[in-house]
């Protein structure tokens, strides 16, 4: 007899992780496979980041961390957001988690109630709708085709918003299409969202440095909706640190406090050693991003 919870029974397995596992199994059998499943950088974690982690181990930096992460890492993230994105946050507006994936899920779980609608532009990362369903919400899919560069328009967004809409998940640069919203395109979406203050934006910016232009624009830059935007980012893609599992949100303090409350009851703070590595990554960020990302553009 299946006695699992209803929420788990309606949850689909991660398609990307299943594909990755299958790819690894075929490779182990000697099959030549090109793995296009998970977003795994081809380069290695930069040496200065690894050295910071080694030092943390030698210094016995191995205790439980505060739930939102150590202040040093959160302050490094605040500086990154200011220097790279021109955005002003405080350490109290940052919450670190076990990867950006958990950060997305934390935010959805903190905001979404039973029956709330969450707008998800398609094509989308496969976990978005499943996370919404896990929170008892309803994913509302907006399809953006190749003729519009896989990016939704303000008219599409306006048409999708209802009294039940709680959030929009916006991924730019996009996983899986690679499409990047321009500042002008984001301004158009922001103008629509400003008319609907009950709608929050979960801005997944984990691929911000994986672009051909090298220029990333955040929807959080627009003052009229800034307080309704929750940025999600982390070290996995830009610094080849997928296995270190450090992500974060930046947003209104009341949402960050709610996420901390939630995270405190199931995973607590992220790995202490990984936090020291991430702190080193953000402290010297742009210096060590440019060369690997240049190779990705070739």
Where are the model-predicted features located?
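A short helix-loop-beta submotif of the ANL/AMP-binding
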Residues: 134-140
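Residue-level detector of conserved catalytic or cofactor/ligand-binding positions
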Residues: 285-298
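Active-site phosphate-binding strand-loop segment of PLP-dependent enzymes
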Residues: 145-213
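Conserved core segment of the aminotransferase class I/II
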Residues: 222, 227-287
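Conserved PLP-anchoring active-site segment centered on the Schiff-base-forming lysine
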Residues: 110-132
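Short acidic capping loops at alpha-helix termini that bridge into adjacent secondary structure
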Residues: 88-94, 114-117, 164, 226-229
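N-terminal small-domain helix-loop-helix segment of the aminotransferase-like
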Residues: 2-99, 106, 281-284
